[in-house]
Amino acid sequence: MSFSHSSLSAQVKSYLTFLPEEIRQKILEHLHCVIHYEPVIGIMGKSGTGKSSLCNAIFQSRICATHPLNGCTRQAHRLTLQLGERRMTLVDLPGIGETPQHDQEYRALYRQLLPELDLIIWILRADERAYAADIAMHQFLLNEGADPSRFLFVLSHADRVFPAEEWNATEKCPSRQQALSLATVTARVATLFPSSFPVLSVAAPVGWNLPAFVSLMIHALP
């Protein structure tokens, strides 16, 4: 059974009539904050993993600049997503791994934004094996106080995983062999980056597995 915010609030009020007025108001104020709280989600990962492309796919619009050769995100880009009665802010953050100078700047930016992030979605390429920069930055965030249970790891470019030529362009889904490859990569990433949530694969440009991603993202929110 589901309730709208107004009907839920009215029902709770009826249950609290026996409490003193001051206590009742404090409970109702807290309930209002919980219901109307807008979580903030940071999207991180190496440059070129498809963070901005994932945002564009979620919003079904080219709201974030992308480029196949150059990183386009240099500052935190805030986007508001409305899902039913719930609003949330997605923060598309600049990707690491381009230059040591940029990484130093981004560490300062990540440190500054970390306290306000309710969830961190970390994007890794499914067709790549070099995760040293990701491991180092993940450890940096943990050392800065990030909650390890607040990370959700996503494999992008699932359509390019071996053997890429077998991607089913008609059905927009991986072949059987690609599915096996994705399972192997998923297991490896889950070992390297322990998380409370399963590792998920997506192919953002063609929309593959995006509904599952959005569902998991909502589930992962506090």
Which sequence ranges carry the predicted segments?
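Switch II of P-loop NTPase G domains
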Residues: 73-76, 93-117, 124-143
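Canonical P-loop GTPase G-domain recognition
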Residues: 159-222
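Alpha-helical scaffold elements adjacent to nucleotide-binding pockets in ATP/GTP-utilizing enzyme cores
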Residues: 57, 116, 133-140, 154, ...
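Conserved nucleotide-binding/hydrolysis micro-motifs of P-loop NTPases
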Residues: 95-97, 127-129, 157-161, 205-208
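Conserved G1/Walker A P-loop phosphate-binding module
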Residues: 2-93, 97
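A short helix->loop->beta-strand "cap" motif at the edges of active sites that frequently abuts
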Residues: 146-151
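Conserved beta-strand segments of the P-loop GTPase G domain that flank and frequently precede/overlap
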Residues: 121-126, 153-156, 201
